[in-house]
């Protein structure tokens, strides 16, 4: 019986170590306000010229299909928008495509990619 408990304890220890390692892959979220242009993330990553009014129709089509949208800062950082603000195929974000916005939310990083999880009321348009 003691040996069975020892195996069970080792299993619990191993499970705990695995869980801790997985948590370490995602940096802890911190609340920030991010300012930049609202873009269709996939198109922007393919070609940095896919911004502004000339790309707005394409970005809107992709956004309505549920493609991730992102804020691109003046320094070139890309923050994928997640959470309630991006719900319902980006409904709350679409009117602001190709505009400069500020979004406040929980910023995290996973495998080098930045994400901002934001509530529906956390977006502010600051420029066209």
Summary of predicted features, one role per range:
Residues 1-10:
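N-terminal secretory signal peptides that target proteins for export/translocation
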Residues 6, 22-25, 38:
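Detector for intrinsically disordered, low-structure N-terminal pre-sequences
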Residues 14-24:
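Bacterial N-terminal signal peptides
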Residues 28-128:
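OB-fold and OB-like single-stranded nucleic-acid-recognition modules
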């Amino acid at each position: 019986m003691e040996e069975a408990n020892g195996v069970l304890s080792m299993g619990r220890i191993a499970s705990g170590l695995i869980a801790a390692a997985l948590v370490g892959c995602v940096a802890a979220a911190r609340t920030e306000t991010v300012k930049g242009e609202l873009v269709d993330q996939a198109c922007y990553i393919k070609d940095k010229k896919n911004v502004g009014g000339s790309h707005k129709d394409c970005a809107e089509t992709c956004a309505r299909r549920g493609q991730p949208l992102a804020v691109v800062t003046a320094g070139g950082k890309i923050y994928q928008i997640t959470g309630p603000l991006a719900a319902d195929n980006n409904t709350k974000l679409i009117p602001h495509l190709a505009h400069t916005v500020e979004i406040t939310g929980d910023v995290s990083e996973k495998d080098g990619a930045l994400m901002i999880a934001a509530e529906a009321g956390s977006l502010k348009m600051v420029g066209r």
